[in-house]
Amino acid sequence: EVYLPYLNNTEKFTLFYGGAGSGKSVFVCQKLILKLLKYPKRTLLVIRKVSASLRDSIYQEFITHLTKFGLIDYCKVMGSSLTIYLPNESKIIFKGIDDPEKLKSISGIDDIMIEEATEITLDDFTQLNLRLRSKAENQQITLCFNPVSKTNWCYKHWFENGTPEDTCIVHTTWYDNKFLPQSYIDSLEQMKKTNPIYYKIYALGEFATLSKLVYNNWRKEDFNWKEVHSKGNTQALFGLDFGYINDPTAFVACLVDTTNKNLYVFDEHYEKGLLNDEIA
């Protein structure tokens, strides 16, 4: 039900992102098949970063839904070239970004679907956007992905500075999928206890950072360090890492609450080119 309002949206760019098991790829496949049936002789290009990953993933997803719709026997399926021709002469072409020469040879593209969009780069996306130059109406690029780091191009381009013009963004999680087996739901709930960061990304579909974190259970909040220290169960600690030209000098001031196992960072400094007397 959460997807139905977006069945016929007209924005040029549509992002379906969120947690694993949310059903977003299923809906997008069904949505695009219906669009291809509505517009005869239309061409849909389906993209993943690596062409070798297409056959067992999104290509098979389209085959599955064409079968469920009772259309597969009326389609011409070219397994060698990963191309599907629909009864009304619309077609679906599956390609990998890692095969740029073959991409250049494709003409008349009317719509593009990018599966696992976080795997490609902004340059890849820009080139794909330039491929939409036919005269067909309602040309669209649809992106599907599970969020990763906020350093990824998807976050920086689509979220960091607000929603861009002519863009529709849809966020869903496994809570929106009524067809999940209980065993899958149980595994996600177990992840919530054992690995909160993975749960945040893969279950809740939020942007986060997966690796190279010393502390992953932190938050920003206002506090008075003097009041915290006055409670008597904290110890003040200060850390200093010397640097100069290539690396900055880093200083951190914190309070350690050993009873409740909390660490309060209340001051820090990070700067290159400091001399010893300036540090002091």
Language-model segments: residues:
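Walker B catalytic acidic pair
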Residues: 115-116
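Conserved RecA-like ASCE P-loop NTPase motor core of nucleic-acid helicases/translocases
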Residues: 42-54
